[in-house]
């Protein structure tokens, strides 16, 4: 079970948002590469970066901070990045800089042809991030709710050749209210590619619950506010996950 620390980037700083609201952000570090090094030193095997400004702007906005992280830890751990990635040139530029996985969200929903092209050109490096509320997909930094069903869309993207799906329950993200285990398992059971859980991780009980259903196809979990607020000790959680599943 991969426990994947999240580093959300806003104006070059590491922050956390509450339910995706840019006006409700808490700054945890003005030097994101220092935070990245911290999680790697504590045993992280993968990092999850989000260019928050980029997600809203539709193009990269925190590339300098991202490149500093890749330069410092990119040779030690896999790094995945989402937010504002809407064209093949951006994907190629980030992969050349040492990124392992590119996360495509809104662009995958709005422009499936782009996702197909990305999977063809960069097979093995494309993850789709599906953000949902009550089973329906949200786009544009969660500001727009669509009528797309998350399971139906995930199955379509699986056929395109994406590496995995990150499933975020946006009603829980940043709220420390607990992972939506049932919805995550339901999605994983419908697919043959792995699912990474996200949104609402609140403590060790969530880690143990996810480990119990890992064999349903759940590869890991994004660790956000809980590891920054102290509600979850990352090192202890990784150790517990290793004990349960390895």
Curated annotation (Swiss-Prot):
SUPFAM superfamilies: Ribulose-phoshate binding barrel. The active site is at residues 8, 131. It comes from the Bacteria. Pathway: Amino-acid biosynthesis; L-histidine biosynthesis; L-histidine from 5-phospho-alpha-D-ribose 1-diphosphate: step 4/9. It catalyses: 1-(5-phospho-beta-D-ribosyl)-5-[(5-phospho-beta-D-ribosylamino)methylideneamino]imidazole-4-carboxamide = 5-[(5-phospho-1-deoxy-D-ribulos-1-ylimino)methylamino]-1-(5-phospho-beta-D-ribosyl)imidazole-4-carboxamide. GO terms for molecular function: 1-(5-phosphoribosyl)-5-[(5-phosphoribosylamino)methylideneamino]imidazole-4-carboxamide isomerase activity. CDD domains: HisA (cd04732). Belongs to the HisA/HisF family. NCBIfam families: 1-(5-phosphoribosyl)-5-[(5-phosphoribosylamino)methylideneamino]imidazole-4-carboxamide isomerase (TIGR00007), PRK13585.1 (NF010112). This is 1-(5-phosphoribosyl)-5-[(5-phosphoribosylamino)methylideneamino] imidazole-4-carboxamide isomerase. It comes from Albidiferax ferrireducens (strain ATCC BAA-621 / DSM 15236 / T118).
